[in-house]
């Protein structure tokens, strides 16, 4: 359905041009998170153009039956060669392309360290969790196909006296049906963003059990920085993207090691590790991210003026 994509881009370009006229903007900065917007870039007179890549679309969208991987790559490459600047939230994203030198900036996700601040949270009693046995092994986020459901189940079975609590969206992953058979797994569903810190506060340790797929291996998710900002011990399946955070994570190379790392994290007593994680999160606060974006965009605009 290539014509649908072209039609969508034409409509989007027209709407943006209309808004630019109504707002009396001249040569705005075009900042897109959508891989299928090359024609939109062509249609708008701009001072700078940015593609902000937050996911491996050629792998992720076909999982949800939302496109052909080759067509997605074609559309994404058409965008890549048009924009002046590319931001990626993981150094593994876009690795299947031969990217233009100097155009790509690896800038991980930012975190709201004010919202995810355990010192400033209200004393809200979460009735869903108040009577659950401790320790609480928590997961916050989408249960997509990039999550290793079997590893969550293995964790629950390895710690039968603990409670495994999951908050977030079920991304129609058929594997999640297996969770219902585990007595100590509690799926609490979606929570508003303002509520999430209260739930993470109740977690004794936090999980990032990514599947051994190209999507899972390329993830550097927002939940990492939210967990860090709350100072929580984090157990994660190892990937190249997470190596730079090894000093603040319990990384595991396989399922057996993952369970051992959960055990170590649960028994953690060193308060300095909490401080270390929170300090790391502040390196990725939104003010720090905005400074990085601003620097890269300014370089792009200056380069365009010179050329």
Regions found by a protein language model. Give the residues of each.
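Nucleotide-sugar-dependent
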Residues: 194-199, 206-228, 235-247
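Acidic anion/phosphate-binding donor-loop and adjacent secondary structure
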Residues: 62-65, 111-128, 177
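Nucleotide-activated donor-binding/catalytic signature segment of Leloir-type glycosyltransferases, i.e.
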Residues: 168, 174-200
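Conserved donor-binding/catalytic core segment of Leloir-type glycosyltransferases
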Residues: 129-147, 152-156, 167
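Membrane-proximal helix-turn-helix segments that form the acceptor-binding/catalytic region
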Residues: 14-21, 67-86
């Amino acid at each position: 359905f290539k014509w649908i994509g072209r039609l969508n881009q034409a409509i989007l370009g027209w709407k943006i041009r209309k808004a630019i006229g109504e707002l009396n903007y001249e040569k705005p900065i075009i900042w897109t998170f959508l891989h299928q917007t090359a024609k939109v870039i062509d249609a708008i007179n701009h001072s700078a153009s940015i593609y902000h890549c937050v996911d491996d679309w050629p792998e992720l969208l076909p999982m949800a039956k939302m496109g052909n991987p080759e067509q997605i790559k074609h559309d994404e490459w058409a965008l890549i060669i048009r924009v002046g600047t590319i931001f990626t939230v993981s150094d593994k994203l876009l690795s299947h392309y031969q990217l233009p030198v100097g155009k790509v900036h690896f800038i991980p996700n930012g975190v709201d360290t004010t919202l995810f601040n355990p010192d400033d949270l209200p004393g809200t009693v979460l009735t869903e969790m108040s009577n659950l046995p401790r320790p609480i092994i928590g997961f916050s986020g989408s249960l997509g196909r990039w999550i290793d459901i079997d590893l969550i189940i293995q964790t629950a079975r390895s710690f039968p006296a603990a409670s495994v609590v999951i908050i977030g969206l079920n991304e129609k992953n058929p594997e999640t049906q297996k969770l219902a058979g585990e007595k100590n797994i509690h799926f609490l569903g979606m929570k508003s963003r303002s509520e999430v810190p209260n739930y993470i506060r109740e977690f004794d340790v936090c999980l990032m059990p990514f599947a051994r797929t190209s999507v899972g291996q390329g993830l550097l998710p927002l939940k990492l920085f939210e967990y860090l900002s709350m100072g929580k011990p984090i157990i994660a399946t190892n990937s190249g993207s997470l190596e730079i955070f090894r000093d603040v994570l319990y990384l595991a190379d396989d399922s057996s090691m993952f369970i051992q790392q959960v055990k170590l994290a649960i028994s953690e007593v060193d308060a300095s590790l909490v401080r270390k994680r929170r300090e790391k999160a502040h390196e990725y606060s939104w003010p720090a991210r905005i400074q990085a974006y601003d620097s890269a965009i300014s370089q792009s605009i200056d380069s365009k003026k010179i050329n």
